[in-house]
Each structure stands twice: as C-alpha cells, then as structure tokens.
Amino acid sequence: MRNFVIEPLHKPSMEECRLRIDNLTKPLYSLARLEGMTERMAGILKEEKPNHLRHAVVIVGADIAVDGPQNQTHGVESLKAMERLASGHSATHGAAKKIGADVFLVDAGLELDTSHIEGVLQHKLAKGSKFFRMHAALTPDMVEQGLDVGFALVDELSEMGYQTIGIGTVGERSLLSALAVTAGITGYPMAELLAENNCTLSIQEKAKQLTASLAEHDLPSQDGVHVLATVGSPDVVVLTGLILGAASHRMAVVFDTAETGAAVLAAKCINEAVMDYVFPSVHMGEPVQKAQMKYLGIKPHLFYGFEMDEALGSTMGLSVLDAGMHMLNDMKTFGEASVNVAVDGPGSERQDGR
C-alpha cells in the first residue's frame, strides 16, 4: 500500500462557514445535521463558502464465496446487473443525472468476464473471493493490489476535478463479506449481526459456526489488511483504498449499505483520520449496518426502507450535500435580507448582522 497523508479538517474555513450558517434567516441550529455536514464540507474543501460540488459515483463489482455451497448461479445474476448498469438506465443513473454526477463501473472480482461490456473498468483481482469458512477469502497480495487500485481510481477522479464520491457495490452474496468484515473488526457477537432468513439453521447455530471460522483466522483484529485478506472481498478492498485515497485528496465520500460500510470500517482501521471525510446516507435496516453505525459513532439520515445497493443510497446522500450547498449559498443572512438579528438568547451570541 502506498504512503499517504490524511490532513485534518481546515478549522478556519469551518468557523467562517458556521458563522454564516448561524447568521442565515432561520432559527439557530434549526437545520440540524444539514448544518454540520455543510460545515464539514467547508473543512474538507478548505473553502468558507463552498458551492456547486462535482460528484462522482463509483460502483465496484465482485462476487463472494464463489467456491461455497451457496453459489448456485455462478455469477450470472451479477453479470446481468453489471450489464444493466452499463446501459445507463438504472435507478442510480437516474438519480445521478439529477445532481450532475457521473457514474463509473469497476469490475474488481466478478466471477464471469465483463470485458465485453462497454464502460466497465477492468481491475479484476480474482474471479470472486473464496469462502472464508474453508480458507482465506483473498491473499495478502490481492489486498495490496486492490488497495492500490482504489488509490489509483481516486487519483484519476481528483485530476478530473471531482470533489465528492458516492460509493456502491454489485455482486452475489455480498452481505456475507460485509458480515464477516464487520464481525472481524468490531468484535461484536455474531448473533447480534445476523437476521432471520430461510436457512434451516437458527441464528444461534449460524453464529456459533461463523464465530469459530473467524477464530481460525485470528479474528477479531484491528489489522484492517489482515481482516480484508482473510474474510474480505475484492469490492470491499478496492473501496477501502478509494476511501483512504479520497481523504488524502480532500474529497468527501458518501456510503450507504453494509457492504460499503465494511470498507469504511477497514479504512478506519488503517487510518482513523479518514472519518472526517466520510458521510453515511440511507438506513438499510440490517443488523450488520446497525452495528457498523454503532461502532463508527455515526447515524444514517435517510429513511426510505431501502433494500437496494448499487450506490443508489449514496447518490441520494450526495443530493443531501447539495442541499447543504443551497442552504449556504441561496439563503440570505439577516444582514443581506435587512432583518434585525436576535437581541437575546443563543442567537444574540452568534448573529452579527453580516
């Protein structure tokens, strides 16, 4: 993995941005999290009054546990999904178009070949990850290669002028990797991360088996690279590198599902400073995502009953950042609107009539 530096947020820009927010013609702190997100964007971009963000959406494809008993379709479904995404007519593309975001597709580890699909960037680490209950999911070399792919992708996006990235995944059995990475990093009891499904085993039985498998890989661990190599997947690895690279370029990252959340967990293990540059988006209702949010100390803010990946939630999260820019730039301050500022209460301490 390359050497990189993640700088802290630019406090002077944040302070000036917060003063403007507090002087907008609204009750103090009434826009809640939107205000904090906007203030943080000022610190990320080193701009007191950022505006007109340039968004990219990156969807990384990989199939999970391709040698495991659950693999009945052998990549056919994920191939169809990537072909559909490449057509440009997906829900994600529709949402991205509304906010002027460009969508990039990456094959990091789909089981079937995608080289015939126009527009899919070819960075295949392997034809899917292995089933971690049988052996390590990846190799250390694959992890190093995948992290470098993520860094290289964000290098290009930065050079192209993008300031924010919404991330997503596509692939079969992807929640299995997210589950294992989350348990492997957080150390939370496996039973808390599992949901009831049609499996013949009870949650307790599944938890016992999976916990034993993690222990065989010396997990849980705070070594993010080790976790990725033993129970991770190509998409999570590439997104981990992308998140770290984005932070080193002072670019914001929006994530959504448990799969993308697993990449955030791994990135935080490698460098905690990355969290200043990361924003959650949709609430998915999965125990795995709930555990990730608890461990990261953050909360999703979009509640739509989502059950879809493919970066749709992240794209909607980018639109929330846009809403913050509209608040900051389109609303008037008390001074601009020729309105008297508060003479008492909390507002009197923050509103200066600017």
Language model regions located:
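N-terminal loops that bind phosphate or other acidic moieties
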Residues: 1-354
